Amino acid sequence: MNTELLIIGGGASGICAGIQAARMGIKTLIIEESSMVGGMFNAAGVTAFDGNKYAVGGGIFGEFRKKIEDHYGGPDNTFTGWISLTCFEPRVGQKALDELIASAGDNLTIWYNTKLVSIIKEANTIKGAIVEPQNSGDSEVSKFRSSEVPVYADITVEATEYGDVLYLAGLPFRFGRESTFESGEPSAPHDPDEIIQDLTYCAILKKDPDNIKIVPPSENYDPERFVNSTAEHSNSSDEVYLNHKLHNWESFISYATLPGDKYLLNWPFRSNDYPTTAEIYDDFEKRKWHLEKAKELTRDYIHYMQTKLGHPEWGIDESAYDTPDNFPPIPYVRESRRGIGNYYMREWDVVPDEYTLR
């Protein structure tokens, strides 16, 4: 199999790169491990944009946002949660993304449910990748006889959620924060660290008091794990000690309210953020185990909402995703491996100052 452009990962960056490249006449193949593209803003369930007003107003993101706003009748109708000006249901996001994919025409091919196995290299040059279908019934890759398919490309793009291309290609990368002495960034720490941001298995909830379904807790469930996630169940009012504000129920449930009496569960305070370790990145089998534990944590928090916080009317939205458990097909991975190249983005590249047009 040969293509001009191979994009490994159909997340937010990968799908946008693929659409634009195909529009420019480049034969493009996207390899996506899950059943859904869109990454953070759809497949991972974060259907409330990080960044407001002008932050996602241009390019493919701007087109995507405009389609969502048009669906709901304007931007005022997507400002349903105080976390974002653009909140939307996953099905609406999928429809908007499908339209953008269609606009790319025949130059764009997407192989879903297809796993990255290894990177093809010649000397110091990446020539493509070997991939493997995980569900041949759902993937165009099934037309090939071999279970592992080599894909050769003029250009290969790293767009995975974890930076797996960097790892498998043996390229240099880093985790954590650089020191201010290395980066020159005033906001960077004095000493570097390898602290990796938490990941979150988000969930879309729906308010339905006539159809209450209590989510069963795990065997590890302990409601005290979530103490101080809101003011409704707390043992301290010292927000300096807690290092965050204590929100009441109304503030909590309006945080990421979606249209249609729905809610994005991605609460940042002592709820369903899952501590991330390097082995999630380095060991693919342990990654699966950790992701199940992250999903378990989210289920436990939903149970906690329904029981300890006294709101059984909020349950998992069974219409949000075509997955067996109605969860998003992938987690929200905040931090990928970061390649160490000739240049990397720094604070001064994005912060406005008097010498730039930003």
Summary of predicted features, one role per range:
Residues Q20, I26-K27, E32-S118, R174, ...:
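Conserved N-terminal/central alpha/beta ligand/cofactor-binding core
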Residues L6-I8, A17, A22, I120-T125, ...:
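Membrane-embedded transmembrane-helix bundle of lipid-linked glycan/lipid transferases
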Residues M1-S13:
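Beta1/beta-strand and adjacent pyrophosphate-binding region of the FAD-binding site
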Residues I120-P150:
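Conserved beta-strand-loop-beta-strand element in the redox core of flavoprotein oxidoreductases
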Residues A12, C87-V92, K288, E292:
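Soluble non-cytosolic domains of exported or imported proteins
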Residues N113, N135, F144-I155, A159-R358:
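Flavin (FAD/FMN)-binding glycine-rich loop and adjacent Rossmann-like elements that form
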Residues A12, K127-A129, A159-T160, D164:
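Glycine-rich phosphate-binding loop of nucleotide-binding enzymes
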